[in-house]
């Protein structure tokens, strides 16, 4: 039995890793301008090709951003589901992404109005502040309501309030600011630069490493707070760490790509079904890979389905993610009845 489980884990990770590699190649090659794998290999080898700028300045940064931010989004969802013991918790569902978007929009409008360039770090800091504000309200509501559905409804209401404030900000922004805000607030991986990719890679890699080393206390926490305390886990410190780390991940995603729906909720469940295990030591890296696969696939469809018109990434993630959430809710209700 133990041997068959190990084989399943190996197959699952191989499948996810190969899927990432295949989708990276597809995202780089497929588009309005077709680029062959031979041209990509030649360009990596230092040879000049016709579409070198499209490859290195547009498609590669965008593909890397989808890979990194997709993984971060799924990981943030997994941390929130673990924290709240709620299978449909996620940055978008709980309004955390909307809070990050609200403060990010306020900072963008204010700084651009003063003709000040908005740096990646500034936008991440602003989005983190917004994420923490929304998280604070969600935590406050979680103390008041014991029902899982009510917590989700509270998060959705917080999200609507934050979105309303964001729309108000956009209404009173000037034309140049509106274009930037509108594209960003819809959710998209377009317009990424290598500077953006480097900043997000550093922030998310550090966060991922910290989360990975928390796998053991998280495993104990999943079995109940009393058990975790008996195992020597500092529950208060663990909760604070989960709040901060999930907020950092959410802030980084919103700062660069805007709010993206359903990835954080759907991917952890799909990955758990693939692995046949909920162990954090497996779920943490698998969620990251799964989120990368999901966002790379959805971004490819968003770019190419109605080319040259591009869909927002949230439109595509909702199509594939929402049915998973419905499946989780139906399964939970059946388990309660049984």
Go through each PLM region and give its residues.
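Alpha-helical transmembrane segments in inner-membrane proteins
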Residues: 1-338
């Amino acid at each position: 039995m133990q041997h068959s489980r190990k084989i399943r884990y190996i197959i699952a990770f191989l499948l996810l890793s190969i899927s990432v590699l295949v989708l990276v190649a597809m995202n780089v090659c497929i588009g309005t301008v077709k680029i062959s794998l031979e041209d990509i290999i030649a360009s990596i080898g230092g040879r000049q090709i016709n579409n070198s700028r499209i490859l290195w300045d547009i498609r590669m940064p965008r593909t890397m951003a989808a890979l990194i931010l997709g993984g971060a989004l799924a990981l943030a969802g997994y941390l929130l589901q673990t924290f709240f013991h709620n299978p449909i918790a996620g940055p978008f569902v709980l309004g955390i992404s909307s809070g990050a978007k609200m403060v990010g929009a306020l900072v963008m409008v204010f700084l651009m109005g003063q003709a000040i360039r908005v740096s990646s770090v500034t936008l991440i800091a602003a989005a983190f502040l917004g994420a923490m504000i929304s998280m604070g309200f969600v935590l406050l509501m979680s103390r008041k309501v014991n029902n899982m559905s009510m917590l989700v409804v509270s998060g959705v209401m917080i999200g609507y309030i934050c979105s309303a404030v964001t729309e108000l900000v956009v209404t009173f922004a000037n034309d140049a600011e509106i274009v930037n805000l509108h594209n960003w607030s819809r959710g998209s991986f377009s317009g990424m630069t290598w500077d953006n990719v480097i900043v997000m890679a550093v922030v998310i890699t550090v966060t991922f490493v910290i989360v990975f080393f928390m796998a053991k206390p998280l495993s104990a926490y999943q079995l109940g707070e009393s058990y975790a305390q008996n195992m020597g886990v500092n529950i208060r410190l663990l909760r604070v760490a989960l709040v901060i780390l999930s907020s950092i991940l959410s802030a980084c995603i919103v700062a660069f790509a805007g709010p993206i729906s359903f990835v954080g909720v759907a991917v952890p469940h799909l990955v758990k079904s693939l692995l046949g295990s909920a162990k954090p030591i497996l779920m943490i890296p698998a969620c990251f890979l799964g989120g990368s696969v999901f966002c790379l696939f959805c971004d490819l469809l968003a770019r190419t389905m109605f080319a040259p018109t591009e869909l927002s990434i949230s439109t595509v993630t909702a199509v594939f993610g929402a049915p998973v959430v419905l499946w989780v809710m139906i399964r939970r209700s059946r388990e309660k009845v049984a």
